[in-house]
């Protein structure tokens, strides 16, 4: 009976596969949004203000960061929880694939969230005259919470590795 239960639990890892497919669709939507922004910029580039252009470029950076985060979560999640990716040509295999454990994924996700939050905060500061001070303060507090959380997770990971190495 125990053997059957273990096989069922182990096979259930494939339930993550549709989640990864959903993330792939999310990445497609982000790509469409990215090119929508590019298409919007092109006819207006000569009449657009510098700050307007910077805001749109920040949006593009934001989309790129979220897209990179999605790719990292999809690939590492697949390799860690579902199955190893069999890429015949090793020269095409991404260098970090197969090397990220759950803790390193968490740290990379946390640092990506901090980077995304930084871009949002910069965009907010560029439009500060249009935004209530309370909203800016709240966004700074949220950003600092992300930063402290990322540091905390990295510290815990570092300490657990030290303890593991002592054993």
Curated annotation (Swiss-Prot):
Kindly give the InterPro entries that the UniProt entry links to this protein: UPF0114 (IPR005134), UPF0114_bac (IPR020761)
Per its UniProt entry, which superkingdom is the organism in?
Bacteria
Q: Which GO terms describe its cellular component?
A: plasma membrane
Q: Where in the cell is it found?
A: Cell membrane
Give the residue spans that cross the bilayer.
Answer: 15-35, 53-73, 136-156
Respond yes or no to whether keyword Transcription regulation is given for this record. Answer: no
Which UniProt key words apply to this protein?
Cell membrane, Membrane, Plasmid, Transmembrane, Transmembrane helix
Entry annotated with the keyword Lyase: no
Which family, according to UniProt?
Answer: Belongs to the UPF0114 family.
> Which PANTHER family does the entry mention?
UPF0114 PROTEIN YQHA
What protein does this entry describe? Answer: UPF0114 protein in repA1-repA2 intergenic region
